[in-house]
């Protein structure tokens, strides 16, 4: 068996690379649509300021896009290096949407992004606008296929286990594509990216307004970001509610951990606003509850129960026992006893083989597992409650803070008095980290909440890892952290540098720092203006 330290280090390495990568992805998703909207306004109005907005914000987008691509490449290699059995077991299914993403969406995006930056003087207005919209389409199609793959990991549909090949095989591509978990995850994730882009533009525009510079540019950027952000944050909240319903349908252990729902209470269940989960005692101390809310969100009804952790553990224990039976039948089939009776018996409990594989963490002989090992494996099916509970509330808290921000910003922009509200501009500026807090904690909830599974109910995480040494993993982990941190420092340096320069970085002669230089030259000292003229003339 692969040691637990190897599995944990492999998980840590993948989590680190994924979280670093997802620092860049949401901003890319959001900025592409903001750029497309800004350029659409430019084409419709013909006003030069909107073209300058596209070019300036596009410069910041380009920096972010380049580093996002760089950090994303490493993740794909890890499926082969760190998760070899995972790649063998489900590679034909998981690889299909990733291959489609690379051959279609990424090529579309990467091709047209060059035309976006270098086609201003070579394309007509309409042609360049089409290019910008195609960049936005490509980035969102990339997200679609990647999240189809991830959604299948959360809720594996359209695939069956083949005992002849000992692998999962795709039997229904339509079910894979239309997986409700994948679709909800896609729209919720891209909407969160739109919010990230809107907060980014809003915060930097507020900085310019506070500094009283490039006001026309900043006002228009503020207005577009506030309107786009308002629509996006409302979408995130609605789609987040839908995501909660899907989790309640197919990932009951994740939902119970998020809500620290230890017991199965009478319907409709109350929502725990805040509290302190005590995992040892299996209770939540000092819980503040809102009646009915959890039941309505998770079940869309007033009479369906939300299953508690204790009952889920008991249910999973029964499924582990079924999995032991199926594992025994699988061994007989592999030994050559492929009678119709054996195959029929195997297929009757085929959905529970993954639960039987949970015992591999404790014993190589699944069918001979002890009662203690079965009970421990059943407990493992519940992710860490405290980390899930607090991460979810951090995500929701950041989301509602941004809702307040966009309501205020949209109202002020509609009344054209945002400059007279320094408290709002400071609120927007200091809110810049909020979308990253929300997206990072949201992904933690999504991925950590799937544990102990790599593929929900099918393949346990401890079986998915490659046979590596801890030394190899520590070395590569340290190298990746150093490299990714360097990339992050480069991104921050370039972003801050160009954000401070603002549209003056376009060198059009129309903006703040360029006008200061022109003013300085115009009022240069006499000796500079005319070397033949006396200094005190």
Curated annotation (Swiss-Prot):
Which positions does UniProt annotate for heme b b595 binding? Answer: 21
Species assigned in the record: Azotobacter vinelandii
Q: What is this protein called?
A: Cytochrome bd ubiquinol oxidase subunit 1
Q: Which coenzyme or cofactor does it need?
A: heme b; heme d cis-diol
Give, as one word, the top-level EC class: translocase
Ranges in the Periplasmic compartment?
A: 45-96, 152-189, 242-394, 493-537
KW Thylakoid (keyword) present: no
The subcellular location is: Cell inner membrane
Give the gene name: cydA
